[in-house]
Amino acid sequence: MANLSSDFQTFTMDDPIRQLAELSNTLHHFQTFPPPFSSSLDSLFFHNQFPDHFPGKSLENNFHQGIFFPSNIQNNEESSSQFDTKKRKSLMEAVSTSENSVSDQTLSTSSAQVSINGNISTKNNSSRRGKRSKNREEEKEREVVHVRARRGQATDSHSIAERVRRGKINERLKCLQDIVPGCYKTMGMATMLDEIINYVQSLQNQVEFLSMKLTAASSYYDFNSETDAVESMQKAKAREAVEMGQGRDGSSVFHSSSWTL
């Protein structure tokens, strides 16, 4: 019994050391394997089945319970990533809803401002147009432009007045053509006016010459009339003197008159 107990103790002491060595070898081998390595670890650990009465079995169970395998880590990471994605989605939805609400508010305010600005701009434009139309009407009333109207196009009042004025000018020019010698219808306006000016100047010269002659004739007539008046006055005085002498000496005058007979 003593030998069995000593052998059992040595077996029990040697088994954990062997198990630790095997675990170190398997871990070293696990580090050399490429991922995925969950199935290889499971195969390594579960193919080596130990009896239940070994004390290392509890250690193996503890090791399986305490160590997190990569499959568990992957599951945890996937769950955490899913949770993060859900959180992100919820945050993005909240941000998008807030942005949409803010954008709607800004659009409503901007549309209201645009409508107000549009009304103000339309009012300003209408007032400006009214002012411009009034200014244009005033300018049209002030400006009087005489435009030469063609035949059949006398529609404006100014063009009608211009047409009437030109008709009167043409009538007067026809009268001058009949009066002034050397003026013909085939002549131009400039040559016709030159002929009329020359004719008027010649008439002025003739009038001046005739006026000089009239002044000379009138002066001569005045001198002759003065001499005739002096002579008539002298004759009248001589007759009066003769008559006075006869009244004083009537007999002598009678004798002289008788002798003369």
UniProtKB/Swiss-Prot annotation:
Supply the PROSITE patterns for this chain: BHLH
An annotated GO cellular component of this protein is: nucleus
Where is the chain membrane-spanning?
none
Specify one Pfam family: HLH
Q: Which CDD domains does this entry report, sorted A to Z? A: bHLH_AtBPE_like (cd18919)
Origin, by domain of life? Answer: Eukaryota
Q: Where is the composition biased (Basic and acidic residues)?
A: 135-146
- Report the residue ranges that make up the bHLH domain in this protein: 153-203
Tell me the keywords, alphabetical order. DNA-binding, Nucleus, Transcription, Transcription regulation
The places in or outside the cell where this protein is found are: Nucleus
- Knockout consequences: No visible phenotype. Redundant with BEE1 and BEE2.
**Where does the record place Polar residues bias?**
95-123
> Where in this protein does the record put region Disordered?
72-158, 242-261
Q: Name one GO biological process term.
A: DNA-templated transcription
The record's induction entry says: Induced by brassinosteroid, auxin and ethylene, and repressed by abscisic acid. Insensitive to gibberellic acid.
Q: Which SUPFAM superfamilies match?
A: HLH, helix-loop-helix DNA-binding domain
* Role according to the record: Positive regulator of brassinosteroid signaling.
Output this protein's name: Transcription factor BEE 3
What gene is this protein translated from? BEE3
